[in-house]
Design a protein with these regions (language model features):
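Bulky hydrophobic segments
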Residues: 1-141, 152, 161
Length: 161
């Protein structure tokens, strides 16, 4: 039978856990960049757009956690749609929304000022997320799955009994 093999629940769970762990690392990097970037003397460009890049990578990974059966390309499309909606929502100025944007959580989640350059940073961040997801998937396949296949090949080779 040709075609895609059915995805096992344990593999989906493992993929989601890896993506969640990566998302936590990306969040820590993003917060560190925002809080310590200027005191460390990093250029404003790096702090601003590096944070946007990491935000989009986080969105990609979290969409992957929530929808593990989707392909990385499908996850990227959804993450890009979320990023575009969030960026263009900055053009909407309702009092309650502007008040939320003034909070730390609002600034980190939604941002404050519309910028087309953010869309470029988001695209790069999503591409980075696809790349990272692929590297982790190949690492997991090379490191985790072969244990089971080696065991099965050893069992198959021990039929001399």
């Amino acid at each position: 039978m040709h075609g895609a093999q059915p995805v096992k629940p344990n593999a989906l769970r493992q993929k989601s856990l890896i993506r969640a762990a990566l998302a936590l690392v990306v969040i820590a990097c993003g917060l560190s960049l925002r809080w310590y970037g200027f005191p460390l003397g990093l250029p404003a460009f790096v702090v601003k757009y590096g944070g946007s890049l990491l935000w989009a990578t986080m969105v990609f990974l979290l969409v992957g956690v929530l929808l593990p059966r989707l392909s990385p390309m499908q996850i990227a499309i959804i993450a890009a749609a979320i990023a575009i909606v969030v960026e263009f929502s900055r053009l909407i100025h309702a009092p309650w929304l502007d008040a939320f944007r003034l909070t730390t959580a609002g600034a980190l989640l939604l941002g404050r000022i519309f910028s087309l350059w953010n869309l470029v940073a988001y695209l790069i961040g999503i591409v980075a997320g696809v790349w990272l997801d692929g590297r982790v998937a190949s690492f997991a396949q090379d490191r985790i799955l072969p244990r089971h296949s080696k065991l099965n090949s050893q069992q198959a080779g021990s039929t001399r009994e």
